[in-house]
Design a protein with these regions (language model features):
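Histone-fold recognition with a strong bias for associated Lys/Arg-rich disordered tails
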Residues: 1-174
Length: 174
């Protein structure tokens, strides 16, 4: 499949991730910034999953702030911040999770599962240190989607992805 529908919430989370990276004077968007974006957004299925798993979102946010120190130089703002290879992997895994669940959209729940599936990034490490496992999160997503149906495809906006010459994923965020 050459394109996926990212919900408006996911697009907002990714914008917030860029803002968090800039706030911390980082010259990149990493998994920690994506997790901060998910926490800051706070109303999507991912936030509901974490809350149902008794995860204190403020504590997780504080843990990230303790782990990553602010950069020294002013970071470029906006869409110019590059995604780290781990952050790109999270997005790939999020699309894979959506595909496995046979969803035509990528919601915050898929982004959360992508973070956990990536395993090695700061975002995943902080979540795992807080006691979140991929299996528990996936089970909770399935439980919540059974009643709430997740974020609707009606709020999804197409975001195309294509491999570049080196085979890495290039995302076209609008």
């Amino acid at each position: 499949m050459n394109g996926y529908n990212f919900t408006d919430r996911v697009r907002m989370v990714l914008q917030m991730a860029r803002e968090e990276a800039a706030r911390l004077h980082h010259e990149y968007v990493g998994t920690e910034h994506i997790l901060l974006g998910l926490i800051r957004e706070g109303e999507g299925t991912a936030a509901a999953v974490l809350t149902c798993l008794n995860i204190d979102l403020e504590e997780v946010s504080g843990r990230i702030e303790e782990t990553v120190k602010p950069g020294k130089a002013a970071a470029p703002a906006g869409p110019d911040l590059p995604y780290t290879s781990r952050a790109k992997k999270v997005l790939e895994f999020a699309m894979s999770e959506a595909r496995q669940l046979q969803h035509a959209y990528v919601g915050t729940e898929h982004l959360l599962l992508g973070l956990l599936r990536e395993e090695k990034g700061i975002g995943a490490q902080v979540l795992m240190d807080a006691g979140v496992t991929l299996q528990e999160a996936r089970s909770e997503v399935l439980r919540l989607l059974g009643t709430e149906r997740g974020e609707t495809a009606a709020t999804a906006t197409p975001v195309l992805y294509t491999p570049d010459a080196r085979g890495s994923l290039q995302l076209a965020f609008q």
